[in-house]
């Protein structure tokens, strides 16, 4: 079994999504979350949990949240898994 190498909680700002056409905003938010985690966790292999996707799409494609709190875990093989962080 692969062990967790690094675990971190991030608050990811999604304010730049407002610059995207309204019908593409949720897709852009998912890409921003993935890109943010790739940059900060230094890995190209990022897997997002279903709960993140459901939160971003909860109000439809035109109104994603302004920020999202995520717990990211990097494993020894370089894969990053992200899930919603409990408060």
UniProtKB/Swiss-Prot annotation:
* One Pfam family it belongs to: Ribosomal_L31e
Q: Name one GO molecular function term.
A: structural constituent of ribosome
Q: What is this protein called?
A: Large ribosomal subunit protein eL31
Keyword Ribonucleoprotein carried by entry: yes
Protein's GO biological process: cytoplasmic translation
The record ties this protein, via PANTHER family, to: 60S RIBOSOMAL PROTEIN L31 (PTHR10956:SF0)
Q: Which domain of life is it from?
A: Archaea
Which species is this record about?
Methanocorpusculum labreanum (strain ATCC 43576 / DSM 4855 / Z)
This protein's GO cellular component annotations are:
cytosolic large ribosomal subunit
Per its UniProt record, what NCBIfam families does this chain match?
PRK01192.1-1
InterPro entries, A to Z: Ribosomal_eL31, Ribosomal_eL31_CS, Ribosomal_eL31_dom_sf
The family note in this entry says: Belongs to the eukaryotic ribosomal protein eL31 family.
* Keyword annotations: Ribonucleoprotein, Ribosomal protein
């Amino acid at each position: 079994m692969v062990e967790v190498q690094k675990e971190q909680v991030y608050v990811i700002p999604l304010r730049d999504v407002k610059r995207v056409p309204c019908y593409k905003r949720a897709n852009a938010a998912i890409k921003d979350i993935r890109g943010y985690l790739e940059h900060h966790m230094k890995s190209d292999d990022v897997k997002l949990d279903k709960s993140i996707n459901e939160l971003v799409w909860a109000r439809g494609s035109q109104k994603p949240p302004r920020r999202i709190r995520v717990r990211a875990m990097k494993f020894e093989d370089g894969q990053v898994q992200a899930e919603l962080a409990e408060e």
